[in-house]
Amino acid sequence: MTTLSTLNKFKKDGTKFTCLTCYDAMFARMMEKAQIDTILIGDSLGMVVQGHDSTLPVTVDDMAYHTANIARSNKQALILADLPFMSYVTLPEAVVNSRKLMQAGAHVIKIEGGCELCELITTLAQAGTPTCVHLGLTPQSVNVFGGYKVQGRGNEAGQKLLDDAKAVVDAGAALLVLECVPAELAKAVTEAVAVPVIGIGAGADTDGQVLVMHDMLGMVHGRAPRFIHDFLTDERNTEHSIEGAFALYQQSVKEGSFPTEQHQFS
């Protein structure tokens, strides 16, 4: 079974690892067969499962339901679960909501933000709840950003993101996710912190990669993000199957053939 210790060893050894979003039992079992290292029950389910335009309507109960689906069905992957929008504004509600997701079967709680999360991160760590901090393009802040845009460009913005990464790790964060940031910045963050860093649209130098499952299967509504690749129709997927797509993703990340320069930002 993959644990945080496994991911830390991967980072130390320079071994890349995989993460995919997942929301139901059948796909969770397929990912177990493909040996996907980590699974994220993302609040992205609001868009790809529930049909919303953003992640904002997702509730803690939604997240707990889908987390339990995965925990019952995949016994090998490390399971990360998102705390959804406005569910961790105050420390007491954050603790209560984190407990709900951990009791549903999550191993790590994912939250979005920077140094303002440090007190929460430390509190959860002391209570035995590991956190993964999502930096860069944080979808719960889409209205603040004015849309889905690359973050961390320019010296000032890049330094702020690097400082936030160091601060949350110092506070006790066990993992980081970097989304849609320049590849050079992602590399700098990965080298600067001791914990594993997972990238999405952040270049090839992060310790691991994550994609939304629907995206990597070519199930995209509207314009496809630059950082995705359709592993279902890839000619290397000789089975032309979903299981084959998961296995090809695992292989491609491990061997370093995904992502490439075409999937990253400068």
Swiss-Prot record:
Keyword match Hydrolase: no
Keywords (A to Z) from UniProt: Cytoplasm, Magnesium, Metal-binding, Pantothenate biosynthesis, Transferase
Chain's role: Catalyzes the reversible reaction in which hydroxymethyl group from 5,10-methylenetetrahydrofolate is transferred onto alpha-ketoisovalerate to form ketopantoate.
Protein name per its UniProtKB record: 3-methyl-2-oxobutanoate hydroxymethyltransferase
Active site: 179
Cofactor(s) of this protein: Mg(2+)
Subunit structure: Homodecamer; pentamer of dimers.
Binding, Mg(2+): 43, 82, 112
Classification of source organism: Bacteria, Pseudomonadati, Pseudomonadota, Gammaproteobacteria, Moraxellales
Top EC category: transferase
GO annotations of cellular component type: cytoplasm
Record note on cofactor: Binds 1 Mg(2+) ion per subunit.
Annotated residues for binding of 3-methyl-2-oxobutanoate: 43-44, 82, 110
The family this protein is said to belong to: Belongs to the PanB family.
Reaction catalysed by this enzyme: 3-methyl-2-oxobutanoate + (6R)-5,10-methylene-5,6,7,8-tetrahydrofolate + H2O = 2-dehydropantoate + (6S)-5,6,7,8-tetrahydrofolate
UniProt EC number: 2.1.2.11
UniProt-listed InterPro entries: Pantoate_hydroxy_MeTrfase, Pyrv/PenolPyrv_kinase-like_dom, Pyrv_kinase-like_dom_sf
UniProt GO BP: pantothenate biosynthetic process
Natural source organism: Psychrobacter cryohalolentis (strain ATCC BAA-1226 / DSM 17306 / VKM B-2378 / K5)
